[in-house]
């Protein structure tokens, strides 16, 4: 029996190394950008992608020891997967290093006109969400717990930043009251677009936050979704979109550069500082370019992660008995932990979710609005 167990262990393939899967992801993103610049008129995606990647990788390499010196080590929740306890103390708040890189590189694409002001507005909301995430991370670190701001406090700050952005966009007439769908279909929402926009800001940023639970997971998915958003904007060719497409590629580049240090085994985590900024930037671009539909499809992993938490909590509360115990749909939520506890190693869950995002991006491009 022992000999058989040894043979079985020898036949089990080792988990995919983080640097290999991260390298493949980077090749996919760069190939898409180069192909767009080669064959699509007015496409300029490769340059901001390359510049942001290089700067982000260097800044993160420089910044990780600084974060470690400040003792900004992640506190791992004890009720999570036990294998994650070994990650305790890994520097967090890495978003502080790379989000400004993406914002600055993306913001330098256009210097005048409406495009420049839109880039400024997107930069504002991205940095505002980074600050909210930073406050949350800092409170968590100073309290030595896995929780920072209260959920209500965090949502209020996010909503306030979103409302300021929407007032700015509304005064300039940048946001359409119709939601563009495939096949020349437009969903007329009129004034309802405004409460929907606030909801999407809150939902998307918290969904990207929930996705940031495994080494490289959120960074890789974010890089792919930003790339997909840029490609569909370039293909649609609407006025003003090329600048925002370039901004998306700068953000994709900053996350690829971050992934050099965040892939398994991670030397740094993005924290809420990075994940909230990621969701805020994606939502802002989607609203300004009437791309809520593509974002919904391409960000399907973010949606699935968020829904898994909602379903888990709802079912548990609905079935809770007198003993205080309820049923669970998933082994643990968010969704990536369900697969982990099912025996799939982290090094396979992450590239699996990346691959799913690639397919979702392709679907979003194929069924893009006109």
Curated annotation (Swiss-Prot):
Pathway: Cell wall biogenesis; peptidoglycan biosynthesis. It comes from the Bacteria. It holds the Pfam family Glycos_transf_4. Its EC number is 2.7.8.13. It is found in: Cell inner membrane. The chain crosses the membrane at residues 15-35, 44-64, 93-113, 115-135, 155-175, 183-203, 213-233, 240-260, 268-288, 296-316, 347-367. Its cofactor is Mg(2+). One of its GO terms (molecular function) is phospho-N-acetylmuramoyl-pentapeptide-transferase activity. The keyword Membrane applies. Keywords: Cell cycle, Cell division, Cell inner membrane, Cell membrane, Cell shape, Cell wall biogenesis/degradation, Magnesium, Membrane, Metal-binding, Peptidoglycan synthesis, Transferase, Transmembrane, Transmembrane helix. PROSITE patterns: MRAY_1, MRAY_2. Its main location: membrane. GO terms for biological process: cell division; cell wall organization; peptidoglycan biosynthetic process; regulation of cell shape. CDD domains: GT_MraY. NCBIfam families: mraY. Catalyzes the initial step of the lipid cycle reactions in the biosynthesis of the cell wall peptidoglycan: transfers peptidoglycan precursor phospho-MurNAc-pentapeptide from UDP-MurNAc-pentapeptide onto the lipid carrier undecaprenyl phosphate, yielding undecaprenyl-pyrophosphoryl-MurNAc-pentapeptide, known as lipid I. This is Phospho-N-acetylmuramoyl-pentapeptide-transferase.
